[in-house]
Swiss-Prot record:
One of its GO terms (molecular function) is L-methionine-(R)-S-oxide reductase activity. This is Free methionine-R-sulfoxide reductase. It is found in: Cytoplasm; Nucleus. It is an enzyme of class 1 (oxidoreductase). Its EC number is 1.8.4.14. Catalyzes the reversible oxidation-reduction of the R-enantiomer of free methionine sulfoxide to methionine. Does not act on S-enantiomer of free methionine sulfoxide or R-enantiomer of dabsylated methionine sulfoxide. Involved in protection against oxidative stress. The keyword Oxidoreductase applies. It comes from Saccharomyces cerevisiae (strain ATCC 204508 / S288c).
Amino acid sequence: MGSSTGFHHADHVNYSSNLNKEEILEQLLLSYEGLSDGQVNWVCNLSNASSLIWHAYKSLAVDINWAGFYVTQASEENTLILGPFQGKVACQMIQFGKGVCGTAASTKETQIVPDVNKYPGHIACDGETKSEIVVPIISNDGKTLGVIDIDCLDYEGFDHVDKEFLEKLAKLINKSCVFK
């Protein structure tokens, strides 16, 4: 997929304005599969995934302000450490069970938070965030490898469609990445 074919890697984030949400998120999944094909390095794959997420949601006119990953720290199994992302600087470490990311990591369940101000124990890395979705990335043996985290400047920025497609992305990440 180089310039000799007329298609560049950056073309993966060119989403058509006439696509609906499901179509754009499906394109995100297909682009991730193409970009991660033959690549198992989690830093590389999550870097591209954070860009794909960022540009997909921006093309939907969803006012996201952060899209990225926290990964389970190898030396401390119950701690998430900041991974690749798009957006403002962020919290560097989050304990399992703390905040939205830590809750998703410990429960292994997607967290959709329509109003972060009403979420008990919310960790505010950016005070402008109004809503958030966090999807755990679970290994084949049931361990939390990390989480996908997306923040939005609007209340109720995420729904069941986001959950469905981001959970598919989490499964693709588990399948394509070696976390070590």
